Amino acid sequence: VKAVVLVGGEGTRLRPLTETVPKPLLPLMNRPFLHRVLDHLGEHGVHEVVLSSSYLESTFRTFLLERHGDPTVTWITEAEPLGTGGAIVNALPHLDDTFLVLNGDILTDLDLSAMVAFHRDHGAAATISLARVDDARPYGLVATRDSRVLEFREKPAEPVPGDINAGTYVLDRESLAGWEPGRMISIEREIFPGLIESGAPVYGFLSDAYWMDLGTPEKYLQAHFDILEGKLLGLRYPSPYRDDTADVDLQAHLGRWVVLGEGVTVGPNAEVDDSVLHAGVTVGPGARVLGSVLGHDVVVGARATVTGSVLAEGARVDDDAEIADARVSAGRVAGRERLTERPL
């Protein structure tokens, strides 16, 4: 089995982190998230993966040069963004008659082997992974009967439970016949509805697997906390989790839900809680970092407070400054005046 991983999005809701690093390459437990996606595919016998993007392509090429082992990766350069469906159509020359599609920003422990078997057993043209949620307002609903998808419903106005598209697919090559390569296509809004309208067998694979879209800072943090809590099959880490090279002063305090990257320094009387700190971050003496994501090489000055914020690579917070609900771009310096910027 081969697979396509969709990595072309710009990750606008995760800015400013994604201004310099594409979302699939942001660290998850101190490794680029795409490693986890590829490892998951390899665990289920996938031997070749196709990636394509037009956004920050050089960063993906560096990642691929540094990655070793299965599955092997074929890279396709998109001259311009092609959308979720366009990227798949463009990859068809490299794929088998039946193949997997994963979103490069979704963390899951879904049993991919079972999903492929379900697809084949039902003679499906397309199979969509489904997750059951208590509140479908952010997603929209997928209506099924006996696992066959009947329609996609708009996001409900009121909080209602239901099944949603969880972003992993099994497709037959024939399901994409007639779609022209090289143009913008949405698999969710064009390809799937078109298949259903034509009467093609589209099925939903409902499971209780873990599922999280890493598209916002809040969900990015929550994914780390869920891993620390042991909610994902096969992923076990101590809590708090710190890289072996992290230097934490004996008088510093780390909360339970904390991840510290390579070379992080936390000074005396500093406090870090409910936060993820990427490689090279420095937290000065007496500083507090709460509910925040700090990108590579961020410096938080002595006695400064950072709460509910996202600081991009190389940002600095002056001594005694207070940062709340802020988005601080790469290399920017936040001064002693209280900085409050509502999230994007």
Please place each PLM-identified region on the residue numbering.
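Extended, small-residue-rich solenoid/repeat segments and analogous flexible loops
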Residues: 183, 196-284, 288
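Short internal beta-strands
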Residues: 50-53, 129-130, 293, 310
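A short, conserved acidic/glycine-rich loop-to-beta-strand motif
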Residues: 122-132
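Catalytic-core segments of class I nucleotidyltransferases/pyrophosphorylases
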Residues: 99-100, 107, 113-120, 133-136, ...
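A structural signal for short hydrophobic beta-strand segments in well-ordered beta-sheet cores
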Residues: 25, 141-144, 192, 204
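Conserved N-terminal catalytic core of the sugar/cofactor nucleotidyltransferase
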Residues: 1-5, 13, 26-114, 144, ...
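Short, high-confidence coil segments that cap the C-terminus of an alpha-helix
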Residues: 46, 96, 123-124, 200
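Glycine-rich hexapeptide-repeat left-handed beta-helix
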Residues: 276, 281-344
